[in-house]
């Protein structure tokens, strides 16, 4: 549920800072891909512009793991300085390349499940030599450096102070997707402000931000507000001036029914290892959503935040690396069905209706800013 567009909101709408956040989740990126296709389609209809792209409407787009890949796809420029991928090309990308990225025949018993070679190959082909500074809007893509034991956040706004972060987009995308046990960590080097070599040893961004990067994306926006006049309205954490759309890759309603305290009391390290990551990711994603919902609500701006998430995945759709055609078809259907579901138990508005409202705000805001710039 989000702000209704009335004459009283237009004055403040122009000042709104818009943020899009996309979760990690491997092949489950098909779900937010479906949502993004719907949203971009609505924007194109409202603005009567088939070339309208999400990067034209969001001030910050952030993602981790597969969400980082989607972020790059919709913000990396092509030869015409437009996003190289439209939102309706995201799901076909997974269908074409997913089976090769998650090809079990390339894995080893001792070592990562997949060798990552095809993933790197397709990233290099699609993203070329493009670097962070060329992104068409502010980005926030996370990774984790296993040499320094610190998160690494790739954003445009950090480049003046830390030019070593101006890495190639394909290096960043592989790094944010390099989930331990699934893909090998990624090493690459850039140059510091003094010309020295700066070395990165990176793994999946979910290690740094878990699977939901919404807080990271908001933090990048508020930090940029200290220096960029375009973000001035959200200084002092004024979330009343922020529109946040957060897209999940789905969780399972069966998870909390799977185990009991009596059962797990007998578990050892191996049994816990099989489920602890799923537990941690589910809990962290819930807490991120809970925190943001609470903050926006306390500021009487709860309608400025929309979390789109499927909480009832079952069977193969819960797996981040099942890229069989049958499962990808199921994931695409999950995304389509999600649009028809209510936002929450307390809010009967469907996600489709909420996203249309969100699109209207984005469209109106863009027009207001364009009109102001023309004077």
From Swiss-Prot:
Localisation per UniProt entry: Vacuole
Tissue expression per record: Tuber.
Motif (DGA/G): 204-206
Record flagged with keyword Transcription regulation: no
One BP annotation, GO: defense response
Family annotation (Gene3D superfamilies): Cytosolic phospholipase A2 catalytic domain (3.40.1090.10)
EC code(s) of this entry: 3.1.1.-
Chain segments annotated as coiled-coil in the UniProt record: 349-373
Function (record text): Probable lipolytic acyl hydrolase (LAH), an activity which is thought to be involved in the response of tubers to pathogens.
Domain topic, free-text comment: The nitrogen atoms of the two glycine residues in the GGXR motif define the oxyanion hole, and stabilize the oxyanion that forms during the nucleophilic attack by the catalytic serine during substrate cleavage.
Further comment: Patatin have a dual role as a somatic storage protein and as an enzyme involved in host resistance.
Protein name as catalogued: Patatin-1-Kuras 2
Organism of derivation: Solanum tuberosum (Potato)
High-level lineage: Eukaryota, Viridiplantae, Streptophyta, Embryophyta, Tracheophyta
